[in-house]
């Protein structure tokens, strides 16, 4: 399945997801404001980190090896059974840690209500989403794209309905509960559709633990854990610095800008997730180079058109998607959009490192991005105010893209 065909399949899911996110984001913005967006950003970061650690960060490894060995039941059994046990073990460990340190986590999340019951539900949701992620990684690897799309669409719609309902009834408390309950609902949707479509033999999950595949998958865990951890820590620092330097209106507006980015980048991200790693894993150097340039020919015009449209319609987008409270975004949107153009092309190169299990390089580039972004944000915010955070974002991606190209120069640029 080529990149364009995969894009068309995922486009259906993405279009529905975008529409649903537009509606839910609007309601959240109107009823919760910039402060609510700020608090939800904190929880989303924590959930993202929880989901990575609870699965030991091996999802990309599962995609790679199921793609390579999907026709060899013996090897596939070793991969899937090992992956299943890893997910169960680490999600249970992480849940115990959540319950033990719930008060500290509550302070980080700025949750000021009785949190014991909340963190019990949060623990269950972490286990649920860990299993969901495992199953989705498997069907990603074996390229069951129609089922993948169906699960995403149904989950997004149900999750949005729950989020909107709880926000309207319970405001910020409802939103905080909706985020974690939705992870449980997502697993239930996945299991129901797996029961109907039966994409693979579930007995493959319940075989012996294979130490050799655990070692191979562990290499991917370092990459998967490093990426979100660096992103979450760096955005956490910058978000809090904006809140401290100015107030939560600025921090919430910056978080809202990231949400707008997430919506218009969703189409390309969903295609990348399903297509790049399985495809790159199978290609030799010459064919991989051709594939990268073929993808760039499609991606670059698309992202330029999208970001140009977003910029020209920025006032309408802010009003429709959010509210007048978020017009601070106008100060940062231009350079943020330019940064996104470079960012999407960095992701193509980053997936080469993942598909080839180049752990050291991947970890270096994740740390490099985070360190540069935090340092530049500090100095440029002090020098130029709120606008400085978008300048830091843009410059960071220029440096990041340049370094990635230099690292991959033999593959991409030297004949």
Regions found by a protein language model. Name each.
Residues 2-60, 91, 95-99, 156-160, ...:
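Signature of the first transmembrane helix
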Residues 17, 40, 44-54, 227, ...:
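Transmembrane helix-bundle signature of multi-pass secondary active exporters and lipid flippases
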Residues 1-3, 179, 191-235, 278, ...:
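Interhelical loop/hinge segments that connect adjacent transmembrane helices in multipass membrane
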Residues 127-151, 338-368:
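Membrane-interface junctions at transmembrane-helix termini in multi-pass inner-membrane proteins
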Residues 5-17, 43, 48, 52-103, ...:
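Membrane-water interface segments that mark the loop-to-transmembrane alpha-helix transition
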Residues 116, 120, 150-198, 368-372, ...:
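Hydrophobic alpha-helical transmembrane segments
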Residues 102-122, 248-251, 312-341, 387:
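Interfacial segments at transmembrane-helix termini and the short loops linking adjacent helices
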Residues 26, 55-71, 141, 200, ...:
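Helix-loop junctions and terminal segments of transmembrane helices
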